[in-house]
Amino acid sequence: EGVEAGQMLAIGVVGFLIATAGFGGSIVFYNSYLPDIATEENYNRVSAKGFMMGYVGSVILLIINLLIITYPAWFGLEGTGTLPVRLSFLTVGLWWFGFAQYAFSRLPKDSDNRLSWKAIRQEGYEEFNNVWRQAKQLVNLKRFLFSFFFYSAGVQTVISLASLFASSEMQMETDELILVILLLQVLALVGAWIFAKLSDRIGNKAGLVVMLVLWTVVCVGGYFVQGKIQFYVMAAAVGLVMGGVQSQSRATYSKLLPPGVKDTTSFFSFYDVLEKAATALGSFSFAFTGQLSGGLRMAVLVLAVFFLIGLVILTRVKIAHERAVA
């Protein structure tokens, strides 16, 4: 039984790693389609709509799986042990596979100049370096990427470790954590729409500045939060700015790409790698500070520092065609 449990754990870990790698790779191509399917004046709206639809899908599937796990008798699964949980994983895979077919059939087709696998291995690293060389020559793109790196360290760490903070510092139970996750997803949908409208009105840079200020306030508030009601309010604020900062970061980056660039995938590959590196930095800083301080409240303040650094760098970015207020 112990060996079987160990084998199942190994399968779970390997499956998680494969899924993470698959998602990380797919999001590069997904993001890179934005300049191909929308004109610059529509980047904010289309990027926000993409995140909004993604959050709608995640909420629907999450609710379905929660019902399967919580009320297995409704689905004829009573007394089947862990089968409802395993079925939930299966539904996620089928959901991804099914909706991927829609994307494959509707998105613009690839060009004919495809590379061999050998060429991909040889040229991939060179393409990455080429993007960085171009970015260094474009001052505003380079500044935005530095800003994005630092505030992404905060954003991705909050997304990944919010439930840990809730269970550790707020002593929240599983059902309460589920409510927090649902709250984040629903309000992220709303936030993506609100901040797309705001960015259209005042400009992407000013919109991001507003969001980073709010993120900083939320992190400082996390240090002082007492009681579950206050935490729910803070989680609601996180949800709003989470959806907004994700969609508007992508739209802003698209606006800063070199004029007439065709290989957007390479640029968004760099963007995604930078985000993953920021996630590693943020998670390490959060865990290290939590270990030193004996709690997670001080660690939340460290995340506020990341947002402030990103905010300061962002103020030096100039975006062509932006409104004067930006």
Residue ranges and their predicted role:
Residues 108-146:
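Juxtamembrane intracellular "pre-TM" segments in multi-pass secondary transporters
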Residues 157-180:
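Short amphipathic helix-loop junctions that connect adjacent transmembrane helices
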Residues 95-106, 245, 281, 301-326:
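Multi-pass alpha-helical transporter architecture, strongest
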Residues 1-15, 223-235:
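Helix-loop junctions at membrane interfaces in 12-TM secondary transporters
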